[in-house]
């Protein structure tokens, strides 16, 4: 295999459209959002379609999985890792407090009681939304359901006297026209591998590493098929007919790359 045959990815299950519609409908009742992105591809895992429903709301963009990523600091993005839970929790709560400071002062000036700010945690599938909420909640957290004006489909969890969070299912982009972007989203575990050609993903990953991170490749090779043959031989991946199992080699290579076995990287290099 030397070329990519896929043209685009159009994978948008019906339940995701319902989530889109629901969030758009509830935007007036949500005070702010936390968008979780992948630090290996913060721009590619940013969901501008969902963000457009909350243009005038306070936003925290949090890039997780920094333990897998090579990244540059960005004033608009808070970077962190769930593998450093205490540090991450402290940074997130401090940032959220600052984010709503002005609103809190406005309410105090009017002699109003401090309201509970409702934050929707959004992001693409498998970026770490639920894991973040599990980190932020206390053992005796209060799960609030059926609040006035809030659909039963959204459960609100109290993480502080002033903050309520709602975890939303991962929502994917409606359409991806550039197949290479789709491959990168597979390699960050956002897109299920079943919807793409896994060999093409492996070939893309090999060529990407060869261009940008040659030192991370486990074996030197002139071509992708040569790489898979070396991989299968070294790992002892042999079929019954004593043939090299290059299909299994491809799957293992992708799994190990996703899990960071070869080192930190960014998927936003040209």
Swiss-Prot record:
Domain called CP-type G: residue spans: 20-174
Subcellular location(s) of the protein: Cytoplasm
Keyword field contains Cytoplasm: yes
Molecular function terms from GO: GTP binding; GTPase activity
PROSITE patterns for this protein: G_CP
Assigned GO CC terms: cytoplasm
Gene Ontology terms: biological process: ribosome biogenesis; translation
Subcellular location, principal: cytoplasm
Lineage top rank: taxon: Bacteria
Binding locations of GTP: 126-131, 170
Keywords: Cytoplasm, GTP-binding, Hydrolase, Nucleotide-binding, Ribosome biogenesis
Role noted for this protein: Required for a late step of 50S ribosomal subunit assembly. Has GTPase activity. Binds to the 23S rRNA.
Family: Belongs to the TRAFAC class YlqF/YawG GTPase family. MTG1 subfamily.
Protein name (record): Probable ribosome biogenesis GTPase A
Species, as recorded: Mycoplasma genitalium (strain ATCC 33530 / DSM 19775 / NCTC 10195 / G37)
Gene that specifies this protein: rbgA
